Amino acid sequence: MRVLFFVFGVLSLMFTVPPARSFISNDECPSEYYHCRLKCNADEHAIRYCADFSICCKLKIIEIDGQKKW
């Protein structure tokens, strides 16, 4: 009987706790500068997951302060 109550308790918690990703939010990449793919390129970093479980990649912003002179 305790096992049955435990199973029902776990099931009720699973259905009452909201999912990690909201169904209301948009699962697409936000603009044309972002791309959904399975692996980001070397000059990109991952931002979020897309709807098909690929990764939304964005170009890295690399700032060069100038060349060091020795």
UniProtKB/Swiss-Prot annotation:
Q: Which keywords belong to this entry?
A: Antibiotic, Antimicrobial, Defensin, Disulfide bond, Secreted, Signal
What pairs make up the disulfide bonds?
Answer: 29-56, 36-50, 40-57
Predominant location of this chain?
Answer: secreted
- The signal peptide stretch is 1-22
Q: Which family does it belong to?
A: Belongs to the beta-defensin family.
Gene name of the record: DEFB131A
Tell me where it resides: Secreted
Described function: Has antibacterial activity. Upon stimulation with lipoteichoic acid, promotes cytokines and chemokines production and secretion.
Q: Which PANTHER family did the record assign? A: BETA-DEFENSIN 131A
Concerning what turns on (or off) its expression, the entry says: Up-regulated upon stimulation with lipoteichoic acid.
Pfam families listed in its UniProt record: Defensin_beta_2
Organ and tissue specificity:
Highly expressed in testis. Is moderately expressed in the prostate and small intestine.
- Protein name as annotated: Beta-defensin 131A
